[in-house]
Each structure stands twice: as C-alpha cells, then as structure tokens.
Amino acid sequence: MDTPRGIGTFVVWDYVVFAGMLVISAAIGIYYAFAGGGQQTSKDFLMGGRRMTAVPVALSLTASFMSAVTVLGTPSEVYRFGAIFSIFAFTYFFVVVISAEVFLPVFYKLGITSTYEYLELRFNKCVRLCGTVLFIVQTILYTGIVIYAPALALNQVTGFDLWGAVVATGVVCTFYCTLGGLKAVIWTDVFQVGIMVAGFASVIIQAVVMQGGISTILNDAYDGGRLNFWNFNPNPLQRHTFWTIIIGGTFTWTSIYGVNQSQVQRYISCKSRFQAKLSLYINLVGLWAILTCSVFCGLALYSRYHDCDPWTAKKVSAPDQLMPYLVLDILQDYPGLPGLFVACAYSGTLSTVSSSINALAAVTVEDLIKPYFRSLSERSLSWISQGMSVVYGALCIGMAALASLMGALLQAALSVFGMVGGPLMGLFALGILVPFANSIGALVGLMAGFAISLWVGIGAQIYPPLPERTLPLHLDIQGCNSTYNETNLMTTTEMPFTTSVFQIYNVQRTPLMDNWYSLSYLYFSTVGTLVTLLVGILVSLSTGGRKQNLDPRYILTKEDFLSNFDIFKKKKHVLSYKSHPVEDGGTDNPAFNHIELNSDQSGKSNGTRL
C-alpha cells in the first residue's frame, strides 16, 4: 500500500478536460436551439414539447439530484461519520414510490407546467402566489450557493481559479438553458451523468490499486468503525440513525422529488404517464449508483488517511476539501484525471443550476405573467421564457458573489432550503390527500409549518447540538511525518449541517437547546410537513371545510393509485365530470389534448372533452 505524499497541482491537461466539459454542454444547447424548428412555444421551451421519453429524463433527474455538494460532501460525511449514510438507499426507494404513486398522477393528468398552478386550482390564487414566492426565493438562494461552495472548496485545494469557475458555470448554464430550453437541460444532464460516473470511477479504481485492493479499504474502514450501518437508536436528537435517515430523509427528499418544480417539471414533460413513472423508477437505479460511488469514495478516503487525517493535520481547512485533496494525491501522475474529477463535481453543479434556472423561468411565466397578461401569444411567451432564463442566470451568479461575503451563513442558507421544502410538501399533500381541506386551512397551515421549521432550524444554527448528538468518529494523525507537509490553508468553508453558523460558545445550555434545537436536521422537513398538514386539517374543519364541489382531478383517486396493477381493464383519466374510458391511461399527455382532438389522423379518444 502506497503512503500519502505531497499532493500535486493542476496542469494544462486538467484545464483542457474541464473546459471540454463546458464546451460540450454549451454545444448541446446550441443544437436544441435549432433542432426540430427551435423553441416555437413556451411549452417547447419549458416542457420540451411534452414528448420526452423515460431514459433521458431519468438520467436528468439523477443529475439534478446529485449536485457538487453531494460529490464533495458525501465522501467527507462517510469519512467523518461512517457508512450509515448508505441507508439513504432505502430512503430513495420510498421517495421514488411516493412521488410516482401519489404526486405524479395528479400533476400529470392536469397537464400543468408549474406545480404551483395546482395550488390555485385546488385552493385559490393567494395560496398559489405564496408557494411561488417561497420557491423562487429558496431556489435563487440555494442555486447561488451551489455555484459558489464547490468553487471555493476546489480553489483552496487545487488552486483552480475561484471566480473563473463561478462565472464560467453560471454563464454556460444560462447559455444552454436560454437557447435550448428543457430539452437542452435534459440532454446536457445525460452527458453530465456520464462525466460524474467517469470521475468517480477514476478515483475508485486508483484508490483500490494504491491501497492494495477492496479488502484493504473495507478492513481499514471496519477497524476505524466506519462500517456502522445499523444504528437503530430511536432518539430523534441523534444526527444520523436508521430512523432519522429513513423517516426524516424520506420527508426531506420527497419535498424535492414530489413537489419541487425543478424535478416535477422533468417527469411531467414525458409523453405518457407510463413514461413519467418509468423515468422515476429508472432514476432510482441512478441514485443508488451515485450513492454507492460516493460512499465507497468516503471509505477510500478513510483507508488512505486513517492514520494521518489531513483535516486535523491542517492540510485542508474544511471537510468538503477532502475529496479534491485525495484526487490530487492519488491522481497526480495522470494528467487530465484530476481535471476529470473537477468536471465530475461541476457536472453536478451544472445540472442543478440549469434545472433551477429552467424551473424559475417556468414558474415566473406560468404563475406571474400568464395569469395577468392573457393576450400574449405562445411565441411571445417563448421569448419571455428565454429572457427570464437570462435574468435568473444573472441573479444566481450575483447570489454566488453575495455568498462569498456571507462566510458561515452558507450553512444557514442550505438549512433554510430544507426548511422551506417541508411546509410546501405539507401544503401539496393537504390538497391531494385531504378532500375537505379549504384555502383558509391551507394558508394557516403553511404559515404555521413555515414558522415552526424556521424556529427549530435557526435555533439549531445558533445553538448547535453537542458532539454526543452528532457522533463524529475518531480521526488520527499519528502516522503523519515530515515529508507529508504541505502549506496550511487559511480560508475556510463549512460542511452543511455539521457546525454552527453563529458559533455561540460558553452559554448555559437550557432544555430547549438540548432538546428542541438538537433535533436531527433531517427532521426539519418532517416537522414542517406534519405541522402544515395538522394545522391545515384542524383549521379547515373549524371553518366548515370546503363548501364547493371538488373536481376529482385535484385529488388522488382510487383509479390513480391502482392504475399500475391492472385491476381495472379500462383505465380512466378523470379530466372532467363526464369521464369516459380510454385505451391506456396516460397514453396522451393531457396538455396536448387540443392538438389530438383537432387531428383527423387520431382515431382514438383522448380522455377529455373540451
């Protein structure tokens, strides 16, 4: 087994590989700007014409889910806290099933572009506006951080130019989003998934070779207590246990996969409901693959540095720099491969940022422009959508610049992103699962859930949980020697959810701090969702419930839930009060029923009457 040595630096070939990834991403945008007649309507631009198929959408969902925060953060998480993080494999399964069987059927049969349009259909315009504004604010904030945080971590270890990377990422994303719309975003994501897999593979293969085999890595991990898969402690104050990951993780990530515009917009762009559901289940395989790669990289990190921790030895200044440090350590003799891993990390960033920009443009056009300017033509809306992509791209780059001045507030912003998702998911669940819920209950429930989530989340940042709650594992520096001594790094970044933003020391710990504020961060969304649901139900009941007849399209019906089990020989899409059977529920995307009905070539019913 090789011993750690002085780390290398970026060379010309590394920059060439990284630049190549950006150029190919931009080229895909140019292609889809003109392919098939270009972006003639807002539906073409925002939804890919609603004719996408399962496999590219599945890969896009995977890429959008796995940002650079995952590529850099998950291995360091495993390095510090152990492989219990791999329990998220079960969480992903539950998330995909809930999203595919509860939320997707309702969104798909309505043929909507913005998920927040559902809130007006189900409740009223005020509820829709609240949901839209919350989404826009959290997404701009989070996207700016996704651009800045990995650039900072990579800059500090590799010397990769910080602002060059930030601006290049933002400009390239804005470029191909503006030109090619959702089709460009999805197919660029497909390319970037390949880059992510190649980057992980290069690190894993070389780590296995240098450490003397997979068995050596696993033995080192076992000896260091990193194979801690099964911690069934039910205490909700423990940061990561089987239950916090399964329960809290399911709520947290369902708020993204189930109701977040960035993800929903992709799978409802599929040409049939079957394809939409299939994209989610294929995506599950991708999630498992990326999780396996990132967890194994974390174990390889520990095997490599089990007796000389670079973080404790001040070789790096924060945990999120450990993966770039490992890459320059083990791949320095292979010009271009460090650049491939940086391209891997930035592929995660590009996919997340492009998804966010496209989603922001969609909700702005659908929720804030179309309802008030109904005379605009589809061509005009397409141009406006492209213009909004440019505006939001610039805002996200500006947010990245602001993030550089925020210092430790980066973690607070990431936490707020999670805290907003829970109440929003509770709001959608209230509408889809509770037929008697009314608009008053929805508004009051959303405000209550949001307030409670902010309370516990901000409190946890000001008064962080004690180490016995987070359970960090032992790190050793006894094996460090004088030949393994690089210049200390001075600038710091912080690992999400592991340290305090405000660093309040020497305060008298109160029961509120040791209990409520010490709640596992994975339960923030859980609390927000459940409070929103409970308050929404109680307020709806106390105000007389919903007084108007409820269109069955707005809730999950028995036919929706059981449609995949062939219980009904004739499936129905209830798109009006006069429902009638069709050959295959979901064969035609309902957003294009007017096209089907006006076509003399279509001989079958489309499941709707206009």
UniProtKB/Swiss-Prot annotation:
Induction: Down-regulated in some primary cancers; due to aberrant methylation in primary colon cancers, astrocytomas and oligodendrogliomas as well as in cancers of the colon, prostate and gastric regions, and glial cell lines. Expression reactivated on treatment with a demethylating drug, 5-azacytidine. Expressed in normal thyroid, localized at the apical pole of thyroid cells facing the colloid lumen, but expression profoundly decreased in thyroid carcinomas. Expressed in normal colon but absent in colon aberrant crypt foci and colon cancers. Present in normal kidney cortex, brain, prostate, gastric mucosa and breast tissue but was significantly down-regulated in primary gliomas, gastric cancer, prostate tumors and breast tumors. It is found in: Apical cell membrane. The chain crosses the membrane at residues 10-30, 52-72, 84-104, 133-153, 162-182, 190-210, 240-260, 280-300, 337-359, 390-410, 416-436, 440-460, 519-539. Glycans are attached at N485. Residues 585-610 are annotated as: Disordered. Interacts (via PDZ-binding motif) with PDZK1 (via PDZ domains 1 and 3); interaction increases nicotinate transport activity of SLC5A8. Increase of iodide influx inhibited by addition of perchlorate (NaClO(4)), a competitive inhibitor of iodide uptake catalyzed by sodium iodide symporter (NIS). Cotransport of monocarboxylates and nicotinate strongly inhibited by probenecid, nonsteroid anti-inflammatory drugs (ibuprofen, fenoprofen, ketprofen, naproxen) in a Na(+)-dependent manner or by prolonged exposure to external concentrations of monocarboxylates. It holds the Pfam family SSF. Acts as an electrogenic sodium (Na(+)) and chloride (Cl-)-dependent sodium-coupled solute transporter, including transport of monocarboxylates (short-chain fatty acids including L-lactate, D-lactate, pyruvate, acetate, propionate, valerate and butyrate), mocarboxylate drugs (nicotinate, benzoate, salicylate and 5-aminosalicylate) and ketone bodies (beta-D-hydroxybutyrate, acetoacetate and alpha-ketoisocaproate), with a Na(+):substrate stoichiometry of between 4:1 and 2:1. Catalyzes passive carrier mediated diffusion of iodide. Belongs to the sodium:solute symporter (SSF) (TC 2.A.21) family. A motif (PDZ-binding) lies at residues 608-610. Residues 596-610 have a biased composition (Polar residues). Residues 1-9, 73-83, 154-161, 211-239, 301-336, 411-415, 461-518 are extracellular. Its main location: membrane. It is a multi-pass membrane protein. This is Sodium-coupled monocarboxylate transporter 1. The lineage of its organism: Eukaryota, Metazoa, Chordata, Craniata, Vertebrata. CDD domains: SLC5sbd_SMCT1 (cd11519). One of its GO terms (cellular component) is extracellular exosome.
